[in-house]
Amino acid sequence: MARTKSRKRSGNNQNKNASVVNNKAEIAAMIDARRLEQKKKGGVTNSKGKTNKVVDAKLEKEFKDVLQRFQVQENDTPKEITKDEKNNHVVIVEKNPVMNRKHTAEDELEDTPSDGIEEHLSARKRRKTEKPSLSQLKSQVPYPQIIEWYDCDARYPGLLASIKCTKNVIPVPSHWQSKKEYLSGRSLLGKRPFELPDIIKKTNIEQMRSTLPQSGLDGQDEKSLKEASRARVQPKMGALDLDYKKLHDVFFKIGANWKPDHLLCFGDVYYENRNLFEETNWKRMVDHKRPGRISQELRAIMNLPEGQLPPWCMKMKDIGLPTGYPDLKIAGLNWDITNLKGDVYGKIIPNHHSRSKKQGRNYFGALISFETPEFENSKEDTQANAENGRQDDKIDDEVEHKLDHFQEDISEVTSAEEKLERNEEESEKQLYTVLK
C-alpha cells in the first residue's frame, strides 16, 4: 500500500511540473507577441515624427521651467575650468551638507601629491612610507650602539631612540620578543640547590638540623602524610635551641658590613640561561689575583728569564701606569730595581696622603663626641700662645691632666674587652641543645 501511494504522489508531482512548464512557455509567447506589437507602433510614430516635432517644441517652451526643477544635478562629473574662471573666486553654499559630509571627510584625509592624483593612504601604509632607516635613526642619537633594527618599526621611533639613550634608563628585557613563557626552559632543571651564605653557616644551623631525630631521607619516609601536615600547622616549639647572642653577632656585628660575593650592577638585567655561579667564581678569581706577580708557568710559556721585567712593563714607560691601579709600584719604573725578586716584580703600596683623607671624612650618621673638640680647641690655643709668646702654664697643666685621664680610661676599656674575649674563647658556649 505504501509503495502504491508513493507512486501516485510521484505521478501527481510530475503532472504538476509539466503544467508549470507549459504555463511558462505560454507566458513567454505572450510577452514576445506584445513586444512585436510595440515595435510596430514605434515605427508608425517615427513616420509621424515630423508633425510631432512642432508640437514637442511648443510644449517644451511652456513646461521648461517646470521640468528643470525635477532634473537631477550631476555633481560627480568634473567640469573644465577656464582661465577666466580660475581668477574668479566663487563661494558655493551647500544646500545638502549631510549628503556630502562623507566625501569631504575622506578628501581631508587623503594626501594630494604633486601630480594632482588623489591617493588614499591607510595608517599602516603611511607609517611604512615615513619609517626611518636604521642609519638615519642611529645618526640622531649620541649612543648609536644601543639602537636595534626593530626600533625603526616603532610607532614613534624618534621618541623611543631618545628615551633609550637617556641616562640611567634600564633597557627592556630581551624576552619580550620570545613567544615562550619566561623561565620556562629546561635550563632550570639543572639549577643548583640553594646554599646558605657563609655568614649564616657560622651559626652551625646546618649541623643542628642534621642531628635532629627523624632527619634526612629515612625520617621523611617514616613520617606519614598526616604527621607531616600536622607538623606544618602545629610545629613543636623548642626543638632548636639557638644561642641568641651568637645569632645577634652574626647579623649586627660580623655581618654589619657583609654583602654577597656578586651583585648585579644597576641596569644589568637578568636573562634566561644566565650562569651567575660562573660569574661569581670569575669575579672572586679576579679579586684574588693582584698585579705585580708572575708565575713560573707563565715565565716558561713566555720564555722570560728570571730577573727580567715582563714586556708590558716596558710599554708602561711610554703609555703610563694603568688607571685602575694608581698606587702600583713597578721595579725599575717608579720603584727600586732591587725589589725585583723571584716572581714579584711590583706591588700595590697605598698612598698615605689618600688614606689620611679617608680617615678625616665625616660620614652621615656618625656619633658626635663632645669631649674631643675641647681637647682640639685647647691644643690650638696652646700653639697660638706659644707662637705669640703668651703661653699659660695653668692651661697646659689642665690639658695634660685631661689627656692622661682620657688615655687611662681608654686603656682600661680595651683591657676589659680583651679579657672578655679571652674568657669567651676559653669557655665556648654550646650553640644549641638537642631536645628529644
UniProtKB/Swiss-Prot annotation:
Residue ranges with Low complexity bias: 12-22
Entry-linked SMART domains: PSP (SM00581)
Superkingdom in the source lineage: Eukaryota
InterPro entries: DUF382, PSP_pro-rich, U2_snRNP_Complex_Component
A Pfam short name: DUF382
Sequence similarity: To mammalian SAP 145. Some, to C.elegans ZK632.11.
The protein's role, per its UniProt record: Essential splicing protein required for U2 snRNP binding to pre-mRNA during spliceosome assembly.
Assembly and binders: Belongs to the CWC complex (or CEF1-associated complex), a spliceosome sub-complex reminiscent of a late-stage spliceosome composed of the U2, U5 and U6 snRNAs and at least BUD13, BUD31, BRR2, CDC40, CEF1, CLF1, CUS1, CWC2, CWC15, CWC21, CWC22, CWC23, CWC24, CWC25, CWC27, ECM2, HSH155, IST3, ISY1, LEA1, MSL1, NTC20, PRP8, PRP9, PRP11, PRP19, PRP21, PRP22, PRP45, PRP46, SLU7, SMB1, SMD1, SMD2, SMD3, SMX2, SMX3, SNT309, SNU114, SPP2, SYF1, SYF2, RSE1 and YJU2. Interacts with RDS3.
Protein's name according to its UniProt entry: Cold sensitive U2 snRNA suppressor 1
Record organism: Saccharomyces cerevisiae (strain ATCC 204508 / S288c)
